Every structure is written in C-alpha cells, then in structure tokens.
Amino acid sequence: MSACIVGWAHTPFGKLAGETVESLIVRVAGEALGDAAIDAKDVGEIVLGHFNAGFSPQDFTASLVLQASPDLRFKRATRVENACATGSAAVHQGLKTIAAGAARIVLVVGVEQMTATPAAEVGRNLLKASYVREEADIDGGFAGIFGKIASLYFQRWGDQSDALARIAAKNHKNGVRNPYAQIRKDLGYDFCRTESEKNPRVAGPLKRTDCSLVSDGAAALVLTDVETALKLNKAVVFRAAQHVQDFLHVLRGAEQDRKSTRLNSSHEIPSRMSSSA
C-alpha cells in the first residue's frame, strides 16, 4: 500500500446529548486536521461514511464536512454507504484515491447518530441493511438475523456458547482501557456466559452481551501518500487492505455454506470439488 494515516480524531461512543450529525462531523474533521498539522486548503478529497437509513432527516450529508473549515469549500466530497462496513468503505475509497494519484491528502470521516430514534424505528432502520425482500419480517430485527446465523453455525459445529462468552468478555475487558468505548466495565466470562435478568437471551443463542449497542459517534482520518507523510511528525502505514462482498441475502448464504460444508465433508465428493469449497 502507498498510503498512510497522519492524523485522526474520535468522539466517545454512546448517547451524546446535544450533538447532531453535523456537529459530530465538524468536530472530528477539524480535530483530525489539527492532529495531522494539515491545512484544510491542502485537502484534495473528502469521503464521508454515513449509513443513516432514516436515523437523520438530513440524508445528503457529504457537504456537511465542509462546515469544519471555510477552506474546504469546493473540495470534492462524496458520501459512501456499505451497511456495517460503511466506515471501512470510506477508508478504502480514500486509499484508492491516493493510489490513483487523484489526491495527495484525503480526509475520511465516519458518523452515525442513532440514540435519538425510538427503539422500534431503530430496528426498522437497521433491517434496511438486510435483504428486505426475504428478511424484513424476521423477529428480533437484525439481531434476529444474526441469531439465525448463529443457530445454523451451532447446528454444524455444536454449541459454541463458551466461545461467544469469551469473545464478549474479551471485548468488555478491552473496553475498560478504551476512553471512547460506550461501556467501560469488565463484565467477566461468567456473566457473559450465563443467561440472566441482566443478560437475557435476545435472538437464537445470542444474549445481550453478544449484541452491539445503539450508539452515537464519529471518527476521522487524514490519509496521505508516503512521500508527504515522511515530511510530517507521525504516520501509520497501511500494509494491506482488502474488500470483499457477500450475497445480500445472508441467511440464504449461511444455509448454502452449511450445506456445502456438510456435502464437502463426504467421501463421495470428488477431491477437486472438496478443495474448491
């Protein structure tokens, strides 16, 4: 890769009262440029990652980044969306811009404001990232979809509740040391493993500690090429970046993967087919 991170900014994640999508964008964009010691006038392109899907009435948000500085006016700005990978998609777009030589400095911003939306509407909004034609009516919303995927996985590989609890416990332990984390409390393996009033089952085998929270927050990166980065105070070089996309109907794909794995484990399947799975 030929790109580096030379500046960054991050708000806490959680219920951020008094903030708006615009204020969050402006805050992290300005802080990231300041952290990089880069003048706004030197930015060649802006990429905003914003899923939205009904969380904010302001659907066109790319130009809101320009509010961070008058010197950003007339800069190229594009909004990208890729469901849960929206922020990563924005970074990938910035990397490709630099690799193509279309800009020397790219400002990448990711934002979401979810907590101001009623819970039922949050569920409907998130389901817009599913295959609506087949998955919009699943009980439990998006958690219900992942609950079904987890159930299919359990059918194939056995009960993995211990592994899920270890993952949740590890994440919460790391959150204690992260000043931006929404929950900074070490819940421990036993709490994450045990279904209880405070950790109820949400969907399928998934408990509350296995599911992500509704949150507000924003983050920003300043990307540049290696030559420019060497002239600045700090840089983190990208060693690699990959982007793959699966079928939108994730449940159908999960079922196909389960059947394929079962079939390919049979001795009756030719080795060529088995090796291609």
Regions found by a protein language model. Name each.
Residues 259, 263-277:
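Single conserved hydrophobic/aromatic residue that forms the stacking wall/gate
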Residues 40-50, 76-82, 106-111, 162-169, ...:
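Beta-strand segments within the central parallel beta-sheet cores of soluble alpha/beta enzyme folds
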Residues 1-22, 31, 132-136, 165-169, ...:
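Condensing-enzyme catalytic core mediating Claisen C-C bond formation in acyl metabolism
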Residues 81-112, 144-178, 221-227:
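Active-site-proximal alpha-helical scaffold in enzymes
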Residues 30-44, 153-158, 230-231, 262:
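Phosphate/pyrophosphate-binding loops at sites that engage ATP/ADP/AMP, CoA/4′-phosphopantetheine
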Residues 4, 16, 52-109, 113-145, ...:
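Conserved catalytic cysteine-centered active-site region
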Residues 22-37, 61-62, 90, 146-150, ...:
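Short, well-ordered amphipathic alpha-helical segments that serve as non-catalytic structural scaffolds
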Residues 7-54:
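N-terminal beta1-alpha1-beta2 module of alpha/beta enzyme domains
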